[in-house]
A protein has these predicted regions:
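Long extracytoplasmic/lumenal interhelical loops at the membrane interface
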Residues: 273-291, 295-338, 359-368, 372
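Membrane-interface micro-motifs in multi-pass membrane enzymes
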Residues: 49-57, 108-111, 163-176, 215, ...
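Transmembrane signal-anchor hairpin modules in multi-pass inner-membrane enzymes, especially those
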Residues: 1-104, 118, 124, 128-141, ...
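Loop-to-helix entry and N-terminal half of a specific, functionally important transmembrane alpha helix
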Residues: 29-40, 144, 356-393
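A membrane-periplasm/extracellular boundary helix in multi-pass inner-membrane enzymes
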Residues: 153, 206-210, 231-277, 281, ...
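Membrane-interface helix caps and helix-loop-helix hairpins in membrane proteins
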Residues: 47-49, 98-107, 156-164, 209-210, ...
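Alpha-helical transmembrane segments of multi-pass inner-membrane proteins
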Residues: 3, 23, 61-63, 89-97, ...
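Juxtamembrane membrane-water interface segments that cap and precede transmembrane helices
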Residues: 40-46, 154-164, 284, 322-333
Length: 449
C-alpha cells in the first residue's frame, strides 16, 4: 500500500521532467524556421529592404536544417505533396523561355516563388512534433500581429497599405487564413499561447474591417460558419461565444460607409461614399477580367503565359490599351500562367491538404494522445476553406499562406500515422503515402513520415 502511494508523485514528477526536457530540447532549426515564417508572411523585408532579411533567415534555417537532421532526402522527395510542389516549380522554370516576358518570369521565379518552395520543404523536413508545429504557429501569429498593429497605427485612406507588397485585400486574406488557427488554439489548446492566439484572432476581425475588403468579409463569414458547424457538442457553447464576439466586433466597428461598400457584394449601386468601380458590384467588376482570363487559358492551355506575368499577358491581349488587370482569381491566375497542368497540380495540393487533415482527425478519435494534432488539423482545414473562398476573388495562387498550410498538413499527417503504427490495440496500419520517413522529434520521440 505504501509503495502505491509513493509511486504516484514519482510518475507525475517523471512526466513533468519529460515535458520540461521536451521544451528545453526544441531544436534551434524550429525556432529559426518560426522566424522565417514571421519574416515571409509578415513581409518584414519591406520595412528593411537593405538588410535582405528573407535571405538571411532562409540561409540560417537551411544551414541548421542540414546540420541537425538525419533524414533521408530521397524519401522526402517521394511524398505526393512534395512532388506536386516541385512539379509546379518545375513548370514555372521550363516555361520561362515561352513567357510573354521571360525576364519578368525569371525574376519572379528566382526572387519570389523560390521562397515559397523553400518554406514548404523546410517545414516538411524539420517540423517533427506537434510542439514544433505550435512554435511555427507563433511565427504566424507574430506576422499577423505585426500587420494588424501596422494597419491600425499607420494605415490611412479608403484602402490602407502597410507594406510594399500587400494591398488591403492581401492583408484581409492573411487575417482570414490565420483566424481559424488562432481560434482553434484558443478553444482547444492549452497554456498561455491560447490567449495570444485569442487576441490575434480578435484583432484579425477588426483588421478585416479596416481593410474594407469585400472578399475578406465573405471569406471570414464562411470561416465563422464552418467553425460553428464543425464544433463538437462539448465545444459548441465556446464556439458560439467566439462567433458572437466576432459578429459584435463587426457590428460595433463597421461604419455606414463600410456597410454601403459591403452591400455591393450582392448588388450594384450603393451609397454616395461608394466609388464608381465598387458600385458595379463584385460580379460587374470581376466578370470582364474572369472572362478574359478564361480565353487566355484556352489560348495557352499547355505551358501558359509564364509565371508572374498574368497582368502583362492580359494587357497584351487587348493591344495594351486601357487597364492592365490582375486575375482576381487564384485558380484562373495559375491556369493562365502555368497552363492547365499547373491548375491541376494546384487543385491537387488543396485536395491533399484536406485529406491530410481528415486523416489526422480520424486517427485522433482512435488515439486520444493526438488531441493537439487534431485541433491543429481542424484549424488548418478551416484556414484552407478560407483560402479557397478568398481565392475566387483574389490573385493568391502563389501565397505563402497556402504553402504554409499544405506543409503543416503533411507534418500533422505524418505524426498521426506514426502514432497509428505504434504497438497497441489500435496501432496497426497507416494512411497511404506517409510511411517510411522517420526522425527524432523535438519531444524526443520518433516521428515517421
Amino acid at each position: 500500500m505504501t509503495f502505491k502511494m509513493e509511486s504516484v508523485p514519482i510518475q507525475i514528477g517523471t512526466r513533468r521532467r519529460r515535458r520540461f526536457a521536451a521544451r528545453a530540447s526544441t531544436p534551434p532549426v524550429v525556432v529559426a524556421l518560426a522566424v522565417y515564417v514571421f519574416v515571409v508572411i509578415g513581409r518584414v523585408p519591406d520595412a528593411f529592404p537593405s538588410v535582405h532579411l528573407a535571405i538571411v533567415t532562409a540561409g540560417i534555417t537551411g544551414v541548421l536544417a542540414l546540420l541537425g537532421s538525419n533524414r533521408d532526402l530521397g524519401r522526402l522527395l517521394r511524398i505526393p505533396e512534395t512532388l506536386a510542389v516541385l512539379a509546379l516549380f518545375g513548370l514555372s522554370i521550363v516555361t520561362i523561355p515561352f513567357s510573354v516576358w521571360p525576364g519578368q518570369s525569371l525574376t519572379f521565379v528566382t526572387r519570389s516563388y523560390i521562397t515559397l518552395i523553400f518554406l514548404f520543404l523546410v517545414i516538411v523536413y524539420c517540423a517533427r512534433s506537434a510542439r514544433a508545429v505550435q512554435i511555427l504557429l507563433y511565427g504566424l501569429l507574430a506576422a499577423m500581429l505585426l500587420l494588424e498593429i501596422s494597419l491600425m497605427l499607420w494605415g490611412k485612406g479608403d484602402r490602407p497599405l502597410v507594406t510594399n507588397t500587400y494591398d488591403s485585400n492581401d492583408i484581409a486574406f492573411i487575417m482570414v487564413c490565420g483566424f481559424p488557427l488562432g481560434a482553434m488554439w484558443f478553444l482547444r489548446g492549452r497554456g498561455p499561447g491560447r490567449y495570444i492566439a485569442a487576441l490575434t484572432s480578435a484583432l484579425a476581425v477588426t483588421t478585416v474591417l479596416l481593410t474594407r475588403s469585400r472578399g475578406g468579409l465573405v471569406s471570414l463569414c464562411v470561416v465563422l460558419a464552418f467553425l460553428l458547424v464543425r464544433a463538437s457538442s462539448r465545444e459548441r457553447i465556446g464556439t458560439a461565444v467566439v462567433v458572437l464576439a466576432c459578429v459584435l466586433i463587426l457590428g460595433a466597428f463597421g461604419s455606414k460607409e463600410y456597410w454601403e461598400r459591403m452591400a455591393t457584394i450582392w448588388d450594384s449601386g450603393g451609397g454616395p461614399a461608394v466609388s464608381a468601380y465598387d458600385a458595379t458590384g463584385v460580379w460587374g467588376a470581376r466578370w470582364p477580367i474572369w472572362r478574359a482570363s478564361l480565353w487566355l487559358m484556352l489560348e495557352h492551355p499547355v505551358i501558359g503565359v509564364g509565371a508572374g506575368v498574368f497582368d502583362i499577358a492580359e494587357g497584351l491581349s487587348h493591344g495594351g490599351a486601357g487597364k492592365w488587370s490582375t486575375a482576381h482569381n487564384a485558380f484562373l491566375q495559375i491556369g493562365v500562367e502555368l497552363g492547365i497542368p499547373g491548375l491541376v497540380l494546384f487543385i491537387f495540393l488543396l485536395y491533399r491538404t484536406v485529406k491530410n487533415c481528415h486523416i489526422v482527425m480520424r486517427l485522433a478519435r482512435q488515439h486520444p494522445q493526438l488531441s493537439v494534432e487534431a485541433w491543429l488539423a481542424s484549424g488548418v482545414e478551416l484556414s484552407l476553406y478560407g483560402f479557397i473562398v478568398a481565392a475566387f476573388s483574389l490573385s493568391q495562387a502563389y501565397s505563402s499562406m497556402l504553402y504554409f498550410l499544405v506543409a503543416i498538413s503533411v507534418v500533422l499527417a505524418r505524426l498521426a500515422s506514426q502514432r497509428n503504427r505504434l504497438p497497441g490495440p489500435r496501432g496497426a496500419g497507416s494512411p497511404g503515402g506517409m510511411a517510411g520517413f522517420s526522425g527524432r522529434g523535438a519531444d524526443g520521440a520518433e516521428h515517421a513520415l
